[in-house]
Amino acid sequence: QFRDWCFEQGMNINTVKRVFASVRSIINLTMREHGIEGSNAFSGTFMPDRGDASTRQPIPTDNLRTIQQRCQTTDDEPRWLVALISDTAMRLSEAAGLAREDIVLDADIPHVIIRPHPWRRLKTKGSERTLPLVGCSLWAAERALEASHHSPYLFPRYCNENGCKANSASAALNKWLKQTIGDGYVMHSFRHSMRDRLRAVNCPSEM
């Protein structure tokens, strides 16, 4: 039932597998620490081949503009998160786990610093980087900063001292993307779109 619920929330097969792996590890540790005998109900759960593991296609430019316009019209925290990612191509967990101090607007070039935090790790060491804030991402950063003045986190809806709720954000935002521009696109698609946008202007590969 939990597996089916995950799919109903819009998660793809890879996301559901990661969720189950995390829960399975937690239960295994708890059973060992407390000497609980028996089997882990999350071990060996059947995962159907849904054919959605590779649906991360780039978002066409027209659809990208539609998304950004909807974000600015709706103007709420989930849409600021989408807008920030749309022109930076950050991973969702990277963006959702940002601290307010990671946003630097008073520099010659406004930018966001991607770095690890106690509540959110980065995927790899090479994931630490600085990204310019332009276009819709700059608007989103300004709006999120203005609204989160009471919190150390840029997106307090998705982040607190206990961790970053990237999985729940992913499910909700993927569902919103589907409602906005149709099937076949997920939050990770913004990374593929940025790759194509950079190639279109002959950006050096090392960038």
Language-model segments: residues:
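Short, Lys/Arg-enriched alpha-helical recognition elements, typified by the DNA-recognition helix
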Residues: 1-29, 43, 174
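Basic, Lys/Arg- and aromatic-enriched nucleic-acid-binding interface segment
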Residues: 13, 17-22, 36-98, 126-127, ...
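C-terminal catalytic core of tyrosine-transesterase DNA break-rejoin enzymes
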Residues: 29-32, 83, 87, 93-94, ...
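Proline-centered turn/helix-capping motifs that create local helix->coil transitions or kinks
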Residues: 31-41, 104-107, 145-148
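Conserved tyrosine-mediated DNA breakage-rejoining catalytic core shared by Y-recombinases
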Residues: 44-47, 97-143
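Exposed loop/turn and edge beta-strand positions of beta-sandwich/beta-sheet ligand-binding modules
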Residues: 53, 78, 108, 127, ...
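Short, polar N-cap/turn motifs at the start of nucleic acid-interacting alpha helices
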Residues: 102-109, 183-184, 201-207
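Active-site/catalytic core of tyrosine-dependent DNA strand-transfer enzymes
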Residues: 117-118, 134-183
